[in-house]
Amino acid sequence: MRGGNRLGAGRKVIPESEKKKRKSVYITDKLYTRIMDTDIENCNNFSQKCMALIELAMENLNKNNQEHSVKRNNILMVRDTKSTYNKTNNNFEKQNRGIKLTFIDLFAGIGGIRLGFEDKYTKCVFSSEWDKYAAQTYEANYGEKPHGDITKINENDIPDQDVLLAGFPCQPFSNIGKREGFAHERRNIIFDVLRILKKKQPKMFLLENVKGLLTNDNGNTFRVILDNLKSLGYSVFYEVMDAQNFGLPQRRERIVIVGFHPDLGINDFSFPKGNPDNKVPINAILEHNPTGYSISKRLQESYLFKKDDGKPQIVDFRCTYQVNTLVASYHKIQRLTGTFVKDGETGLRLFSELELKRLMGFPVDFKVPVSRTQMYRQFGNSVAVPMIKAVAGAMKERLLLAEMQVLKK
C-alpha cells in the first residue's frame, strides 16, 4: 500500500527548530580562509564547516559549565589529522577522542619540522639529532632528549612509525657552501633515511632541503635521491616552496619532498600555495631597540662596508618588503653579508631572539637555552614552520582520502 494513512508514509516532517534557514553574517577574508582551511569530519563546504564549528563551540561552552562529561558520540571532532591506517586490519585507530598518527623526527635540529607537523592527534615516537647544542634546545622545548648520530643507530632499534620526517643536512647542497653534494663527508646521510624507509615502511614521509639540491652536480644528486626513493615503491612528489608565501617576512626557498606508501594507491598530491598576494613585510616583526644586539662601530667599519662581495641588507621600521634568507652563519659578520636592522645603540644591530622566532614562524615562548652564537646557528639551520605546517595539513588530508577509499573496498 502506498501513501494514504500508512504509518510513516509521505515526506518526513522536519520540526521548525531543525530546519536550515539562510542567515547572513559578515566575516573578514582572513577568517573565511581559516574556516575553509580547517579540516572537519564530514564537512565539505563553507556552510557545513560554519555549522560544525558553531556546534562545537556551543558544546565546549556547555561542557565547561558542567562537571559531568559529555558522551563520546555527542562530540563533534574538529581535527587536522582525520585518520590513520591500521596496517594489520585496515581499520581506523582511535585514541583519546582523536587519531594518533605516529612519527619519527630525524636530523631534528631544534624541532622545526616537528613543530609544523605535530598536533594533539599525532605522537612522536623517536627523534635523532647529532649536534649537542641543538639537542639541548630540542629537549628544553619537547621534554625529550633526541638520540644521537643516526648513522650509528640500527634501524631495528627505531620504533615503527606512520610518518618519517627529516630535514637532512643542507650544507652539501647549499648555494652558500661549495655545493659538494655526494662528495661531501655527510653524503651518506640521505642513505640513512633510505635504509630506515626500507625497513620501517611508513605510510608517508616528508623531507626538506635547500633549493640547491635540485641543481647540484647538474641535477644528478637529486636524480639519485629521487630514484632511490621511488625504488622503494613510494609515490614521490616535490616542490620548491618559499617561506614568504606562508606569512613570514623572509625569502626562503626550500625543496620539500613528500612520499606515500604504495599500499595507499596515491598517485597525485597538491602542495599548498600559501598566500603570495598577502605577504608580511619585515617591519611587521621588528621590535624597537632590544638590548644586547648592537654591532660595534669597529665591526661596521672593518667588515660591513668594506667587503668586495657586496654590501649587507639594511632594514628599518619603514621597510615593507621581505628580507633575504636567514643563514646559519648570520652571526659571523666578518664572513658574510647579511640583513641587519638600523636601530640600537650603535645605529646597527643583529636580529633579536624574538625577531628570529618571528622570521621562522616559531612561537614566542619557544625556549632558547643556548649561547647567542648557537641561537643564530640553530634558527638559520631550521625550517619555516608555517610552510611545513601547511604541507603537513595537505599530507594528512590526502592520507585520509586514500584510507577512506581503502576502507570502501
Curated annotation (Swiss-Prot):
CDD domains (UniProt xref): Cyt_C5_DNA_methylase
SUPFAM superfamilies noted in UniProt: S-adenosyl-L-methionine-dependent methyltransferases
Reaction catalyzed: a 2'-deoxycytidine in DNA + S-adenosyl-L-methionine = a 5-methyl-2'-deoxycytidine in DNA + S-adenosyl-L-homocysteine + H(+)
GO MF annotations, alphabetized: DNA (cytosine-5-)-methyltransferase activity; DNA binding
Keyword DNA-binding: yes
Highest taxon of the lineage: Bacteria
InterPro entries: C5-MTase, C5_DNA_meth_AS, C5_MeTfrase, C5_meth_CS, SAM-dependent_MTases_sf
Gene Ontology biological process terms, A to Z: DNA restriction-modification system; methylation
PANTHER family from the UniProt entry: TRNA (CYTOSINE(38)-C(5))-METHYLTRANSFERASE
Protein known as: Type II methyltransferase M.BsuFI
Organism of provenance: Bacillus subtilis
Taxon lineage: Bacteria, Bacillati, Bacillota, Bacilli, Bacillales
